[in-house]
């Protein structure tokens, strides 16, 4: 009897038993998921031949705008530099670079408002932005008269509901969260009044530049939003908004923004995502392009406003997949930011350019990059504003020795970014 029962059990577990059925069910589910995933994505046109057959060549930065036919065209960096040469030679050229950082954009927004309140905010001839910095950039470009709108966007809680999960979005779509809420939020602030104001300032020769990442070519794309705004047509308004949405679309979290264009009688498209994928921040035009006849531009000042920190406090990482991946990604982003900052500081010194930078101290108590609630962002905004008002926001990167951080008023009374030991160590480590 025992042998008969054992044989029956083995038969049940055989080719048609429960174990077999479970394996079959799992295999079917995996195949269906893979098939649906392959079919669910948005249909894409073939890549342009110059993208699919050629590796990117090292070349001077080109800045994209709209051409007279409302199609994309590029503006060479040396042309941009010539616009600014008068300001540079007069010793009044100020450049602002705003980094990415998600909800940490509240730090950058508060810093600008605080500078205005202290009467210490320069008139920036060039404003560049990446990701969260791209969303701040138009207000930084327009100046203190737009501070109320800037403050509202980061303290009112209007962004609190931007994260809407997609049903099985990570498996069947291009992102975990819906893209429409982010686009609606940005569209709410990209008004006709804002575009007209940007266009008026751009007409004076000032530059508003924002970076996205072309995921097809793997390269950053710099957009001249001032020139785009000057066209004033409806598709210019849409492109202005779409560039901002793309620059803030963290891959995997939000879907890419697909932009269509025509060339040589053919229609192509490009998928653009967060500019911070390729550029933590950028200074434009290149220092060498601004310099005239190789002469140092000692009247040029660059301000790098980092929406987040450039260092991490040591901590014991849980030996779990999620914790290890999260910590590793954060460490990589911090190192990328530090490396870019060191390169910018070194290059600035070589060309006689003054560079100052500010970042959220590593010891700041709340680090929630994707918590867009007012409860998370308002304290950061107010913190940065207070530090700016008290002249403790910026660390000066000395163009002579680059050996230590210098605070403008020499005081260490307020525990603000310029007092943070981690930032000072970075400055001392510079060659």
Residue ranges and their predicted role:
Residues 2-3, 27, 246:
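Short, intrinsically disordered or compositionally biased N-terminal tails of bacterial proteins
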């Amino acid at each position: 009897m025992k042998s008969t029962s054992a044989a029956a059990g083995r038969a049940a577990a055989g080719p048609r038993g429960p174990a077999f059925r479970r394996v079959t069910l799992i295999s079917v589910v995996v195949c269906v998921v893979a098939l649906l995933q392959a079919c669910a994505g948005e249909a894409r046109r073939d890549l342009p031949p110059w993208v699919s057959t050629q590796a990117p060549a090292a070349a001077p930065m080109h800045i994209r705008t709209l051409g007279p036919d409302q199609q994309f065209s590029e503006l060479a960096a040396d042309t941009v530099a010539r616009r600014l040469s008068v300001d540079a030679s007069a010793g009044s050229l100020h450049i602002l670079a705003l980094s990415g950082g998600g909800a940490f954009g509240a730090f950058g927004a508060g810093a600008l408002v605080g500078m205005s309140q202290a009467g210490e905010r320069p008139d920036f001839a060039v404003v560049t932005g990446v990701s969260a910095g791209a969303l701040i950039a138009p207000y930084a470009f327009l100046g203190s008269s737009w501070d109320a709108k800037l403050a509202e966007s980061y303290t009112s809680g209007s962004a609190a509901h931007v994260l809407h999960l997609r049903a099985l979005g990570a498996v069947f779509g291009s992102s975990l969260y819906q893209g429409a809420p982010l686009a609606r939020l940005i569209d709410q602030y990209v008004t006709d009044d804002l575009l007209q104001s940007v266009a008026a300032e751009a007409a004076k020769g000032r530059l508003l530049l924002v970076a996205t990442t072309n995921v097809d070519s793997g390269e950053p794309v710099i957009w001249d939003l001032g020139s785009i705004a000057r066209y004033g047509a409806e598709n210019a308004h849409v492109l202005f908004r779409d560039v901002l949405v793309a620059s803030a679309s963290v891959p995997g979290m939000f879907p890419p923004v697909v932009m269509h264009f025509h060339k040589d009688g053919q229609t192509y498209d490009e998928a653009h995502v967060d500019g911070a994928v390729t550029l933590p921040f950028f200074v434009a035009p290149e220092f060498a392009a601004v310099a005239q006849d190789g002469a140092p531009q000692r009247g040029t000042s660059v301000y790098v406003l980092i929406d987040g920190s450039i260092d991490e406090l040591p901590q014991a990482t849980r030996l779990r997949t999620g914790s290890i991946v999260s910590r590793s990604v954060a460490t990589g982003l911090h190192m990328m930011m530090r490396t870019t900052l060191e390169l910018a500081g070194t290059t600035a010194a070589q060309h006689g350019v003054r560079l100052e930078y500010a970042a959220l101290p590593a010891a700041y108590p709340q680090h929630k990059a994707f918590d867009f609630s007012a409860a998370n962002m308002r304290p950061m905004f107010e913190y940065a504003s207070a530090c700016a008002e008290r002249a403790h926001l910026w660390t000066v990167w000395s163009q002579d020795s680059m050996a230590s951080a210098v605070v403008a008023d020499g005081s260490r009374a307020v525990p603000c970014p310029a007092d943070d030991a981690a930032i000072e160590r970075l400055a001392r480590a510079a060659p």
